[in-house]
């Protein structure tokens, strides 16, 4: 995957460029991302997490091969070149099997890596930082690195077997807290120290040497660290460059390495740009994209209520609420407080747990019903101005068709545009 290696090379040469990673499996989010990358003639990095997609199907019901097929089919339908598409696997390791003994969890992790690599994923994030059932808490750097090296060996062997060459690119390390947004209310966040980052790198270098993997070190392109960015349900901790200065300077001593920043969702455009300048040059974004999708759908549902008799409405918001109450497993342990606080969180939280519910057949039917209702006749411009004001400006200037799908996709692309600008470089 020359795109990533070339991006890192240019960044290390002073271009202050980067790349964003779209971490979503929602078809409309992916369509928005593919169309945006196509219009801007940039490569597109799409990542699946070990929770979403695994050899058993993950919570999306897709294996890595299924996910690749799904994304490639969508890209083909939109005439996006396959060679500009990069697929990544995020937090690959024993994450899904922490309740099992380490030996069993790591055997599953071996198979997880095989399934991702065999399916053609080229950017592999090795994350063995989580303790399994019979492990100490927390794990030492050495144990984490030994397990990552074991998975790297599996990945290399699988890649050679299936593709005749080893061209994988690796990301190592992890951020704190866990992926997908913090569970608790945040006020400040500890930035990874340079010493901790160096210790992670050295432990991995030593473990890779022991596995005979010295040659792949230049293909370890990024280290995941915590630059001090995070979000909870209603708050965002903004990037403060001064707190990350020492960390940022530390990576300048490694000629083929940059940082990868997770949970960059909801950062300001200025913060996103500064992160890239400060060598956090791979920006992960996921919940902010499905949050934008949800915003657009709620806006269209409000427009529908103004235009369509109640008995003919899709009732999307009520259907969504009913399904979330019937199946609370994706939000119950995340949203706290009284009934009203939990209701607001279900609809509006930055952590966007609602994203797990869009594939539900009842909700999908209501979405299709909403789109049908609003596609029958033109949406009055004053209602677009009221509920989707940013899109209204583009509709009036003639650059955007005011159909439900185009309004949704463009609203998502407003977020992608911030990431594109941050990553463009000088």
UniProtKB/Swiss-Prot annotation:
InterPro entries: Aldolase_TIM, GatZ/KbaZ-like, GatZ_KbaZ_carbometab, TagBP_ald_KbaZ
Any one annotated GO CC term: plasma membrane
Coiled-coil positions: none
Gene Ontology biological process: carbohydrate metabolic process; D-tagatose 6-phosphate catabolic process; phosphoenolpyruvate-dependent sugar phosphotransferase system
Pathway: Carbohydrate metabolism; D-tagatose 6-phosphate degradation; D-glyceraldehyde 3-phosphate and glycerone phosphate from D-tagatose 6-phosphate: step 2/2
SUBUNIT field: Forms a complex with KbaY.
Biological role: Component of the tagatose-1,6-bisphosphate aldolase KbaYZ that is required for full activity and stability of the Y subunit. Could have a chaperone-like function for the proper and stable folding of KbaY. When expressed alone, KbaZ does not show any aldolase activity.
Family affiliation: Belongs to the GatZ/KbaZ family. KbaZ subfamily.
Record protein name field: D-tagatose-1,6-bisphosphate aldolase subunit KbaZ
Source organism: Escherichia coli O127:H6 (strain E2348/69 / EPEC)
């Amino acid at each position: 995957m020359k795109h990533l290696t070339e991006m890192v090379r240019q960044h290390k040469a002073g271009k202050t460029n980067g790349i964003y990673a779209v971490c979503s499996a929602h078809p409309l989010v992916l369509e928005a991302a593919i169309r945006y990358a196509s219009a801007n003639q940039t490569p597109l990095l799409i990542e699946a997490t070990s929770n979403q997609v695994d050899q058993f199907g993950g919570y999306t019901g897709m294996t890595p091969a299924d996910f690749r097929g799904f994304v490639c089919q969508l890209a083909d339908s939109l005439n996006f070149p396959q060679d500009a598409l990069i697929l990544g696997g995020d937090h690959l390791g024993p994450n899904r099997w922490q309740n099992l003994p380490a030996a069993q969890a790591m055997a599953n992790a071996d198979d997880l890596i095989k399934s991702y690599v065999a399916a053609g994923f080229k950017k592999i994030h090795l994350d063995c930082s989580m303790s399994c059932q019979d492990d100490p808490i927390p794990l030492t750097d050495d144990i984490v690195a030994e397990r990552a090296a074991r998975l790297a060996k599996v990945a290399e062997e699988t890649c050679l077997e299936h593709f005749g060459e080893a061209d994988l690119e690796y990301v190592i390390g992890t951020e704190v807290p866990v992926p997908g947004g913090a569970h608790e209310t945040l006020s400040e966040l500890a930035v990874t120290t340079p010493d901790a980052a160096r210790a992670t790198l050295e432990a991995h270098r030593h473990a890779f040497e022991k596995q005979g993997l010295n040659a792949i070190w230049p293909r370890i392109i990024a280290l995941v660290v915590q630059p001090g960015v995070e979000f909870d349900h209603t708050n965002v901790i903004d990037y403060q460059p001064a707190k990350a200065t020492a960390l940022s300077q530390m990576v300048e001593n490694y000629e083929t390495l940059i940082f990868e920043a997770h949970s960059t969702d909801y950062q300001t455009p200025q913060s996103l740009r500064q992160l890239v300048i400060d060598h956090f040059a791979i920006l992960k974004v996921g919940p902010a994209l499905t949050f934008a999708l949800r915003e657009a759908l709620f806006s269209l549902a409000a427009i529908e209520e103004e235009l369509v008799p109640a008995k003919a409405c899709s009732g999307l918001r009520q259907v969504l609420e009913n399904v979330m109450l019937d199946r609370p497993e994706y939000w119950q342990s995340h949203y706290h407080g009284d009934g009203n606080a939990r209701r607001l969180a279900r609809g509006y939280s930055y952590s966007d747990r609602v994203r797990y519910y869009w594939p539900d057949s009842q909700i999908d039917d209501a979405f299709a019903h909403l789109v049908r209702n609003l596609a029958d006749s033109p949406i009055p411009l004053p209602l677009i101005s009221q509920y989707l004001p940013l899109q209204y400006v583009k509709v009036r200037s003639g650059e955007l068709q005011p159909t439900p799908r185009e309004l949704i996709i463009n609203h998502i692309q407003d977020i992608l545009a911030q990431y594109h600008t941050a990553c463009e470089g000088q």
